[in-house]
Amino acid sequence: MRQCSRRIFLECGLGACAASTLIPPLSARQTMPYYKAVFDERFEDARAFAGQATARATPTVAIRGDVTNLFFNDLDARWKLGPVWLIGFTTSASLFCLHLLARDRGMRLRFCRTNPNKKAVEGVLDGALPLDAVKVPVAPGDPSDLVLWVLAPSARASAKEIANG
């Protein structure tokens, strides 16, 4: 059996120590840092979504189909500082308006699913975004169909560009 030199031993030891600092422990991983969880309070499933978001320490904001007050009293000022992660469980009409406003601020629709099941809602709240293609509902079918969505900063957007733009 060949002996290991001190030099090789030290290099391997230092390499292992350096690698361990690059890999965060499982307990250090955080849930998705959503700025707000938007929900349409007219629907029971959306209210349940708000309860789940609150349990995960995500601030919630209720709407009743119209996003005007939310935009002018909250999101407009926040988006001037830079794009943020936003999650919602609303009608497709509400998503349509928020998506257009968010696009102008360097954000994009990252996830969108119509009438998701409870497991999918919990997964997205915990930060698990499926890699399937984003399909924006073009024309609303049933007005009571709810859409679970995530708006996120686009790859090209930076907080400096948004603040100066």
Describe each region flagged by the PLM.
Residues 1-17:
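N-terminal secretory signal peptides and thylakoid transit peptides that target proteins
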Residues 20-24:
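N-terminal low-complexity, intrinsically disordered segments
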Residues 27-165:
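Extracytoplasmic/lumenal soluble domains of exported proteins with redox or metal-associated functions
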